[in-house]
């Protein structure tokens, strides 16, 4: 069992299989040309898998594959099958922008993927182009529909932005309800790579918009979940991730592994420790030592103060795996 210095059980590993992404979303990617880590610096699937096995053997129960955009890396469905084949009953999930999902969903399902979180910030093609800096909406919608039809557990992630999609939040919920997916509204999280003109909506503002159509009640959430959970009168549940006022640091159960092998204890933590050389040398003992050191270094609370003006990591979310 993996336990940090504050007695929190860590049983959730987020693995960024690549920092590359085919979108350049304004709330995530920098304006300047993207420079990735380089092929030689990225862990192979086999190297990632060997580290994942260490974690699974020590009590990790949930693996989420992220990016960048995980579906731009070739062979990711084979990687899913490797992980799924190692431990039965594993909660194996992926976060994706959905662009390539329609083509790859069946292979991912066959490989053992259970759940998919898909980004959808608007149902308007012009706005989608503005946010992602390319035409993406048709592909994303097709990906969502395919995933829902195949029986994946689907969540739709929507970053709530003032003067961008604030007039669509109800429409997006209705879309998610129709598809049988849960929507989660995400407060815009300031980071050094986001466009400076963006402004987000907070939880109260989001609820105020939704309540114009629906009666809402807050319900008990999982203690490890980053989102507040709400229910409509018809039983439909939706979430709001509101780190500005309600972090979940006291129950945080996760570590993050970047594509280049950096093991990171917190999304807003600048530093981590690299397992790359240990994994390439096949030095499992050394990898375990690094894992234990990162557990010991896991902070009690993130460095981002509740007013959003605290120290913000210069590591972009696309590098850490959001």
Curated annotation (Swiss-Prot):
It catalyses: GTP + AH2 + S-adenosyl-L-methionine = (8S)-3',8-cyclo-7,8-dihydroguanosine 5'-triphosphate + 5'-deoxyadenosine + L-methionine + A + H(+). [4Fe-4S] cluster 1 binds at residues 21, 25, 28. GO terms for biological process: Mo-molybdopterin cofactor biosynthetic process. It is an enzyme of class 4 (lyase). Disulfide bonds: none annotated. Keywords: 4Fe-4S, GTP-binding, Iron, Iron-sulfur, Lyase, Metal-binding, Molybdenum cofactor biosynthesis, Nucleotide-binding, S-adenosyl-L-methionine. Pfam families: Fer4_12, Mob_synth_C, Radical_SAM. GTP binds at residues 14, 64, 95, 155, 254-256. S-adenosyl-L-methionine binds at residues 27, 68, 119, 189. Binds 2 [4Fe-4S] clusters. Binds 1 [4Fe-4S] cluster coordinated with 3 cysteines and an exchangeable S-adenosyl-L-methionine and 1 [4Fe-4S] cluster coordinated with 3 cysteines and the GTP-derived substrate. Belongs to the radical SAM superfamily. MoaA family. HAMAP family: MoaA_B (MF_01225_B). This is GTP 3',8-cyclase. It comes from Campylobacter fetus subsp. fetus (strain 82-40).
């Amino acid at each position: 069992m993996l336990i940090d210095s504050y007695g929190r059980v860590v049983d959730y590993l987020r693995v960024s299989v690549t920092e590359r992404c085919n979108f350049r979303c304004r709330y995530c990617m920098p304006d300047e040309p993207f420079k990735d880590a380089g092929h030689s610096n990225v862990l192979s699937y086999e190297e990632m898998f060997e580290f994942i096995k260490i974690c699974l053997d020590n009590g990790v129960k949930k693996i989420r594959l992220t990016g960048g955009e995980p579906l731009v890396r070739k062979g990711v469905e084979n990687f899913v099958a490797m992980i799924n084949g190692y431990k039965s009953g594993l909660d194996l999930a992926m976060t994706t922008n959905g662009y390539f999902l329609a083509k790859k969903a069946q292979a991912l399902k066959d490989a053992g993927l259970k759940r998919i979180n898909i980004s959808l910030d608007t149902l308007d093609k012009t706005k989608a182009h503005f946010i992602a800096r390319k035409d993406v909406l048709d592909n994303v919608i097709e990906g969502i529909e395919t995933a829902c039809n195949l029986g994946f557990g689907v969540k739709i992630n929507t970053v709530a932005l003032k003067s961008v999609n604030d007039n669509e939040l109800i429409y997006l919920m209705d879309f998610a309800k129709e598809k049988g997916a849960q929507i989660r509204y995400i407060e815009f999280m300031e980071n050094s790579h986001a466009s400076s003109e963006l402004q987000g909506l907070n939880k109260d503002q989001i609820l105020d918009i939704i309540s114009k159509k629906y009666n809402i009640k807050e319900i008990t959430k999982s203690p490890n979940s980053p989102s507040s959970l709400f229910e409509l009168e018809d039983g439909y549940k939706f979430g709001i991730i509101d780190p500005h006022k309600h972090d979940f640091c006291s129950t945080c159960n996760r570590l993050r592994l970047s594509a280049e092998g950096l093991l990171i204890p917190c999304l807003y933590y600048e530093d981590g420790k690299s397992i790359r050389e240990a994994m390439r040398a096949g030095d499992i003992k050394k990898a375990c030592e690094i894992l234990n050191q990162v557990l010991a270094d896991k902070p009690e609370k993130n460095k981002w103060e509740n007013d959003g003006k605290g120290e913000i990591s210069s590591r972009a979310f696309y590098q850490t795996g959001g």
